Amino acid sequence: MGLETEKADVQLFVDDDVYSRHSGVDYGDSEKFTDLGVDRDPRRLNSHLQLGFEDVIAEPVSTHSLDKVWICSHALFEISKYIIYKFLTVFLAIPLAFAAGILFATLSCLHIWITMPFVKTCLMVLPSVQTIWKSVTDVAIAPLCTSVGRSFSSVSLQLSHD
């Protein structure tokens, strides 16, 4: 009573192309979605986000829920993932794209007009600074270090056991 004695063989058949692009959701009107063939991630920046139900929920063989519960939870997972993503993109995509555009424009401007001229100026000045620094070390620091080295080289220590 209430216990399953036979295993039911439940299979979900989804076309690979449709599943990878649409998360298994069947669209009612195919004319509205004619541009889905365009790859919006050609460099595969977000390939790690292609999660399916089996990647998140897994029941070991020893503990299975009822087949209808498994099928309904799979369907609800896919539908809620689809609907929540669409809902969030409606409200967040445009403001976040605007903010990202401002951020990248600012960083590009700073890099082009401040950072690179500063780096090029430093690289242009460095040979003369290197020559001056070598002269300063040869004239002032090298004799000082040589004198200190000679002074300490004449020091000898003897240990005695008393």
UniProtKB/Swiss-Prot annotation:
One example of the protein's molecular function in GO is: D1 dopamine receptor binding
What membrane topology term does the record carry? Peripheral membrane protein
Q: Which InterPro entries match?
A: Caveolin, Caveolin_CS
Q: Which UniProt keywords apply?
A: Cell membrane, Cytoplasm, Golgi apparatus, Membrane, Nucleus, Phosphoprotein
- Where is this protein found? Nucleus; Cytoplasm; Golgi apparatus membrane; Cell membrane
Its PTM note reads: Phosphorylated on serine and tyrosine residues. CAV1 promotes phosphorylation on Ser-23 which then targets the complex to the plasma membrane, lipid rafts and caveolae. Phosphorylation on both Tyr-19 and Tyr-27 is required for insulin-induced 'Ser-727' phosphorylation of STAT3 and its activation. Phosphorylation on Tyr-19 is required for insulin-induced phosphorylation of MAPK1 and DNA binding of STAT3. Tyrosine phosphorylation is induced by both EGF and insulin.
Give residue ranges on the Cytoplasmic side: 1-86, 108-162
The Gene Ontology biological process terms listed for this entry are: caveola assembly; endoplasmic reticulum organization; insulin receptor signaling pathway; mitochondrion organization; negative regulation of endothelial cell proliferation; positive regulation of dopamine receptor signaling pathway; regulation of cytosolic calcium ion concentration; skeletal muscle fiber development
Q: Which residues are annotated with the PTM Phosphoserine?
A: S20, S23
Q: Which residues lie within the membrane without crossing it?
A: 87-107
Q: Name one GO cellular component term.
A: nucleus
A single Pfam family it belongs to is Caveolin
Identify the main location. Answer: nucleus
Top-level taxon: Eukaryota
Q: Phosphotyrosine-modified residues are where? A: Y19, Y27
Recorded family membership: Belongs to the caveolin family.
Tell me the function of this protein.
May act as a scaffolding protein within caveolar membranes. Interacts directly with G-protein alpha subunits and can functionally regulate their activity. Acts as an accessory protein in conjunction with CAV1 in targeting to lipid rafts and driving caveolae formation. Positive regulator of cellular mitogenesis of the MAPK signaling pathway. Required for the insulin-stimulated nuclear translocation and activation of MAPK1 and STAT3, and the subsequent regulation of cell cycle progression.
Complex formation? Monomer or homodimer. Interacts with CAV1; the interaction forms a stable heterooligomeric complex that is required for targeting to lipid rafts and for caveolae formation. Tyrosine phosphorylated forms do not form heterooligomers with the Tyr-19-phosphorylated form existing as a monomer or dimer, and the Tyr-27-form as a monomer only. Interacts (tyrosine phosphorylated form) with the SH2 domain-containing proteins, RASA1, NCK1 and SRC. Interacts (tyrosine phosphorylated form) with INSR, the interaction (Tyr-27-phosphorylated form) is increased on insulin stimulation.
Tell me what this protein is called: Caveolin-2
**Source organism (scientific name):** Dasypus novemcinctus (Nine-banded armadillo)
Q: Which gene encodes it?
A: CAV2
